[in-house]
């Protein structure tokens, strides 16, 4: 079972996605475009940037809702799939958190984190299983 989200190390910078000043400028501009888009959902969990689809773990724990979902945090394309993570006290106001799971070179999930689920384990921690 994967480690609880708050115990995960920061996401590594992938060799194919260097954090160059140009990349940061494009990501910042992209956030402004999304913020001002009249068609962007206002009452729907949405990451600040990147691709989102397939909620794979929605649970209530500790007085909050926790949502895990397929997410490409670096581009708006269906690739480089991570598990994004958001939480909410009321299913209307969402807090975005660091990715809960990310692909790692040399492992079975190197091609992406796809389907799975989240559960509250016997020790009270949030656990995730994925394929």
Stretches found by the model and what they are:
Residues 1-130:
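Carbohydrate-active catalytic/glycan-binding domains of CAZyme proteins
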């Amino acid at each position: 079972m994967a480690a609880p989200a708050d115990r995960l190390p920061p996401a590594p910078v992938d060799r194919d996605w260097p954090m160059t000043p140009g990349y940061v400028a494009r990501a910042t501009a992209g956030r402004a475009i999304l913020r001002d888009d009249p068609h962007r959902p206002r009452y729907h969990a949405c990451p600040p940037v990147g691709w989102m689809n397939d909620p794979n773990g929605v649970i209530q724990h500790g007085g909050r809702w926790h949502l895990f979902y397929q997410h490409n945090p670096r581009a708006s394309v269906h690739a480089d799939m991570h598990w994004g993570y958001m939480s909410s006290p009321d299913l209307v106001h969402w807090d975005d958190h660091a990715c809960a799971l990310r692909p790692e070179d040399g492992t079975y999930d190197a091609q992406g984190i796809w389907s799975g689920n989240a559960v509250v384990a016997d020790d009270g921690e949030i656990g995730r299983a994925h394929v």
